[in-house]
């Protein structure tokens, strides 16, 4: 039944994703982070106090998320096993973001194909932290490909990894870790102190999933009739060409599969950031690379699901 729940949740994400205006745990986690952050900032003046307060915030948010998820699931199972199973499917479904990621990428791709540069810049600004107001088509394409490649890890592979390790409650706790990093894990002045623990713990949580993504995306590249060997080679060569210890693993693998370059200089919060280049520019990046990257994401996520199901069956002896 557990494996069936995994499969149904994955299929639901593939088909419908997160319908707009539906209640979603990540939104609740975000509200909790905002509430706790306000308290921490009020009572923790100075960088040292903010770092400690940020650590307490991380423990409170992640612990509360795991505890509530475990409690809701346990209560639902006591009401009725089938109700508990349905709640488990729903929880797992909410931790996966493949369809939402694909839709967000396609929202940028569509105006690009129609030569509506202004609209594509606006849509890209919804999914990246960089300044998009002056970006040209090649830079927009690169931003979308990087976003899909990076979020293949924290939107699909990592939730499945923690689902395998500790069930739906641990997958929900991972989403709290990831949401904390998304909201406060920045290096600029406002969040550097309060978000330090959140940023570092997100790096820890994604350490193994990011490295697993290198292998899965390399295999996916071969299955998609791209260069799987080049994906693995470039992915390994450029795996540390990023300020994050994890992001370049998936980005470099995708760059290698497509034969393009990612990374490079961008503006974040009014500051120019010169990132290392990732991959080799064997050709110019194009709008078609967005759909190719989405395809790689889906194949890699399918492989991840199959891998964790096989591992679960091997450990439990239950097919």
UniProtKB/Swiss-Prot annotation:
Q: Pfam families in the record, alphabetically?
A: CobD_Cbib
What stretches pass through the bilayer?
56-76, 82-102, 153-173, 204-224, 296-316
Membrane topology, as annotated, equals: Multi-pass membrane protein
Q: Which biological pathway?
A: Cofactor biosynthesis; adenosylcobalamin biosynthesis
Q: Where in the cell is it found?
A: Cell membrane
Cellular component terms (Gene Ontology): plasma membrane
Q: Which InterPro entries match?
A: Cobalamin_biosynth_CobD/CbiB
The Gene Ontology terms for molecular function here are: ABC-type vitamin B12 transporter activity; threonine-phosphate decarboxylase activity
What are the alphabetically sorted keywords of the record?
Cell membrane, Cobalamin biosynthesis, Membrane, Transmembrane, Transmembrane helix
Q: Name one GO biological process term.
A: cobalamin biosynthetic process
Q: Which domain of life is it from?
A: Bacteria
Q: Which family does it belong to?
A: Belongs to the CobD/CbiB family.
Q: Which HAMAP family match?
A: CobD_CbiB
Instruction: Write out the function statement from the record.
Output: Converts cobyric acid to cobinamide by the addition of aminopropanol on the F carboxylic group. However, the true cosubstrate could be (R)-1-amino-2-propanol O-2-phosphate, leading to cobinamide phosphate.
Q: By what name is this protein known?
A: Cobalamin biosynthesis protein CbiB
Species in which this protein is naturally found:
Salmonella paratyphi B (strain ATCC BAA-1250 / SPB7)
- Its gene is cbiB
């Amino acid at each position: 039944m557990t494996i069936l729940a995994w499969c149904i949740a994955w299929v639901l994400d593939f088909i419908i994703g997160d319908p707009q205006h539906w209640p979603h745990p990540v939104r609740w986690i975000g509200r909790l982070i905002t509430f706790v952050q306000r308290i921490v900032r009020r009572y923790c003046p100075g960088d040292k106090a903010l770092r400690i307060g940020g650590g307490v915030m991380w423990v409170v948010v992640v612990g509360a998320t795991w505890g509530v998820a475990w409690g809701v699931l346990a209560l639902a199972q006591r009401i009725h096993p089938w109700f508990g199973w349905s709640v488990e499917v729903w929880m797992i479904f909410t931790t996966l973001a493949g369809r939402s990621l694909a839709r967000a990428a396609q929202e940028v791709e569509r105006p690009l194909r129609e030569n509506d540069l202004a609209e594509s810049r606006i849509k890209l600004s919804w999914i990246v932290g960089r300044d998009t107001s002056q970006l040209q088509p090649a830079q927009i394409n690169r931003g979308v490909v990087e976003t899909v490649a990076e979020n293949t890890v924290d939107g699909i592979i990592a939730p499945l990894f923690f689902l395998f390790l500790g069930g739906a409650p641990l997958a929900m706790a991972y989403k709290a870790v990831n949401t904390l990093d998304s909201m406060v894990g920045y290096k600029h002045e406002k969040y550097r102190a309060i978000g330090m623990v959140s940023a570092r713990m997100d790096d820890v949580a994604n350490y193994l999933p990011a490295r697993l993504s290198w292998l899965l995306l390399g295999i996916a590249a071969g299955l998609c009739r791209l260069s799987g060997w080049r994906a693995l080679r470039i992915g390994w060569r450029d795996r540390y060409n990023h300020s994050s210890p994890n992001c370049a693993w998936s980005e470099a693998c995708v760059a290698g599969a497509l034969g393009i370059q990612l990374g490079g200089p961008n503006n974040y919060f009014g500051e120019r950031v010169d990132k290392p280049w990732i991959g080799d520019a064997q050709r110019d990046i194009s709008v078609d690379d967005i759909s190719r990257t989405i395809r790689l994401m889906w194949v890699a996520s399918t492989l991840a699901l199959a891998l964790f199901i096989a591992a679960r069956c091997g450990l439990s002896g239950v097919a």
